[in-house]
């Protein structure tokens, strides 16, 4: 049976002045959303978590675009904690896809930079 996890990230900008040697990324994940689809492409489960940024911060544009507020992120898990929960949620036999390669590249870059 084929299952698909479709992932979508929301990100905030990391100001150039906040980019440190250990984190060079221009963006930082603030939300991981995903749906699990069965072989008929029907939604059978959902995953959603906010992610507390370590280097970036919300600006009015991202809040207006996503509806995510600083209050949502204040007690959110770190990227390490969020990724651990996300990976545990993904079935072993599922194919993971995203709307574009940007989200998968973001996960890779951020995981590498944060030693996840």
Enumerate the predicted regions with their spans.
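Conserved non-catalytic scaffold segment of RNase H-like nuclease domains
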Residues: 2-108
């Amino acid at each position: 049976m084929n299952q698909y996890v479709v992932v979508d990230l929301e990100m905030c900008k990391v100001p150039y002045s906040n980019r440190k040697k250990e984190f060079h990324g221009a963006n930082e994940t603030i939300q991981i959303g995903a749906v699990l689809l069965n072989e008929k492409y029907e939604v059978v489960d959902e995953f959603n978590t906010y992610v507390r940024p370590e280097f970036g911060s919300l600006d009015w544009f991202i809040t207006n675009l996503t509806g995510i507020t600083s209050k949502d992120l204040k007690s959110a898990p770190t990227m390490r904690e969020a990724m651990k929960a996300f990976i545990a949620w993904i079935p072993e036999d599922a194919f993971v896809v995203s709307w574009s390669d940007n989200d998968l590249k973001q996960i890779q870059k951020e995981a590498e930079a944060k030693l996840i």
